[in-house]
Regions:
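Bacterial N-terminal signal peptides that target proteins for export
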Residues: 1-11
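N-terminal mature ectodomain segment of secretory-pathway/periplasmic proteins
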Residues: 28-110, 144-146
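Hydrophobic h-region of N-terminal signal peptides that target proteins for export
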Residues: 13-23
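Flexible, processing/modification-adjacent segments and terminal tails
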Residues: 24-33, 43, 100-170, 190-196, ...
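Short, surface-exposed linear segments at secondary-structure transitions and domain or protein termini
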Residues: 74-79, 102-105, 121-126, 184, ...
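Residue-level detection of beta-strand scaffold positions
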Residues: 12, 81-85, 171
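A short, sequence-level motif marking secondary-structure junctions
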Residues: 69-73, 98-100, 116-120, 178-179, ...
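Gly/Pro-enriched, hydrophobic low-complexity segments
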Residues: 52, 87, 150, 154-250
Length: 258
């Protein structure tokens, strides 16, 4: 659950993987409210899984790694995501919220940054918190919430937040499956001048009373940047608070070390 760079793939629209049909527009806020209401009081508050991460260098050669990811909704309403980069006992990883991140090396804090994880409001927060909070957290994506189109994604009805024309394949945008009320695609930019990253969330499985995308693929300028394949997922179990502290990185009680 990380965002590496960013891109759009115009070929996707050309070959019909993504098609958009004009329909009566609604606001992005209304779409987020629909997502929230569909699972209010039902969505899981904890999640953990093993992630096979494949990254592609400038020459296209892949490198492989195993990450261990733990997510929880805190009592005060925050979504936290801990990513252990390799063996949790090595102490290397990142702790994310929607607006901040803390990088650890050898179990010591190496950096604290005012940039968060843009996935979190869309895969967890939207179902657990007031929509106004989700709107604030998504402001940094620069998705235009006043623009909405309806269409299809991989043969399923979808709503696209952030565009007003079927020809727009470059503006920041969020695609939401109409039946499941989950995000299936995002186009996001790190800076206004950089190409967007095209992020696909797929292979959804029903977990608890919600859903989990078990494969994420990211491309920039049509070239793969990172793919994520999830395994051994579980929801609804207790996660030790020690896994989510920002002043220390501890593997004590980590589910992957038991």
């Amino acid at each position: 659950m990380s965002i590496a760079s960013r891109l759009t793939s115009p070929l996707l629209l050309a070959v019909g993987s993504a098609t958009i049909a004009a329909a009566q527009p609604a606001s992005g806020r209304d779409v987020l409210q629909r997502m929230h209401d569909a699972y209010a009081g039902k969505w899981y508050s904890t999640l953990r899984f093993v992630q096979k991460t494949t990254r592609y260098g400038s020459g296209g050669a892949p490198t492989f790694a195993t990450w261990y990811e733990s997510l929880r909704q805190t009592p005060d309403g925050q979504t936290q995501l801990r990513i252990d980069l390799g063996d949790p006992t090595a102490g290397n990883g990142v702790l994310y919220t929607a607006d901040s991140s803390w990088v650890f090396r050898g179990a010591k804090l190496a950096a604290a940054r005012p940039e968060g994880n843009e996935f979190l409001p869309l895969i967890e927060g939207v179902y657990m918190q007031p929509v106004d909070a989700t709107m604030r957290q998504l402001a940094t994506t620069n998705v235009d919430m006043s623009r909405v189109m309806h269409g299809t994604w991989e043969g399923r009805p979808a709503t696209v937040i952030g565009i007003a024309s079927p020809a727009d394949s470059v503006s920041p945008q969020i695609w939401v499956d109409d039946e499941r009320n989950v995000v299936v695609r995002m186009l996001l930019r790190p800076t206004p001048s950089s190409p967007p990253m095209d992020i696909h969330l797929g292979d959804y499985v029903h977990v608890g009373d919600g859903w989990l995308a078990t494969k994420v693929a990211m491309t920039v300028d049509g070239k793969p940047v990172q793919t994520e394949d999830y395994a051994d997922w579980k929801v609804g179990m207790p996660l030790p608070a020690d896994l989510f502290t920002t002043n220390a990185w501890s593997a004590r009680g980590h589910w992957a070390t038991r």
